[in-house]
Amino acid sequence: MIYTMKKVHALWVSICLMLNLAPAPLNADSEEDEEYTIITDTELPPLKLMHSFCAFKPDDGPCKAIMKRFFFNIFTRQCEEFIYGGCGGNQNRFESMEECKKVCTRDNVHRIIQTALQQEKPDFCFLEEDPGICRGYITRYFYNNQSKQCERFKYGGCLGNMNNFETLEECKNTCEDGLNGFQVDNYGTQLNAVNNSQTPQSTKVPSFFEFHGPSWCLAPADRGLCRANENRFYYNSVIGKCRPFKYSGCGGNENNFTSKRECLRACKKGFIQRISKGGLIKTKRKRKKQRVKIAYEEVFVKNM
């Protein structure tokens, strides 16, 4: 009798277990299908970065400090926090979320367009063409700093740099000589009393400077991470001159020189001056009345 009751009890337990487990595969399949559908239906616009280094993975460096920093994540398309060791690493590292967004997010482009001076070319116009890492075959335009013209190239479809325009007109308005598209909304004009024509007001940086040096000379001055206060020089590509700054003693970038002469030797190569009338381009030549320029030109030619 006891054996029969145990057998019946075991049978009912088996039936209950079968009923509870039977729907599980169906639910699992439906959940997988639902999750798959969500993934495939999600489409994001092509990612176009302002700088290629914004695509670098976060690098905490070889040191062991614990410092809160931010990097741009190309997968989430957002600036995120990571722990930095205090030395080394790469350029995709920012001290604040705001700085990260300002440098790497596309939303900041409109702000740059509205505030850039009319006679200045943006720094990214001097960057070389960069097709990116993808394998697309998209026609785009870039500004060639050697030919001084906008030219066509094939873009892979992702990453690259900001010297990348969808139309030839957009490229010309932004980077070629003359009045480019980077205008301040309230930018005024003044009437020329001689020819009764409107001419732009003078800007803080003359438009007749052209830069042809190494690409890393375009980097801004970087004080670094330590607490020293060393006198160094960096090349300011906007005005074409080497300027002093205070270096902390570690970190920073390659645009960092112990002397002004060393800075000029590295970054002044190919620096030319364009005559404003007629748009002609020529290098500086020796003139008897300009002894200072002669001495400078001798050094310049020697280091070519």
Swiss-Prot record:
Key words of the record: Blood coagulation, Disulfide bond, Glycoprotein, Hemostasis, Protease inhibitor, Repeat, Secreted, Serine protease inhibitor, Signal
One GO term describing the cellular component: extracellular space
Signal peptide, first to last residue: 1-28
The UniProt record lists the keyword Cell division: no
GO molecular function: serine-type endopeptidase inhibitor activity
Residues marked Reactive bond (site): 64-65, 135-136, 227-228
Protein name: Tissue factor pathway inhibitor
Source organism: Macaca mulatta (Rhesus macaque)
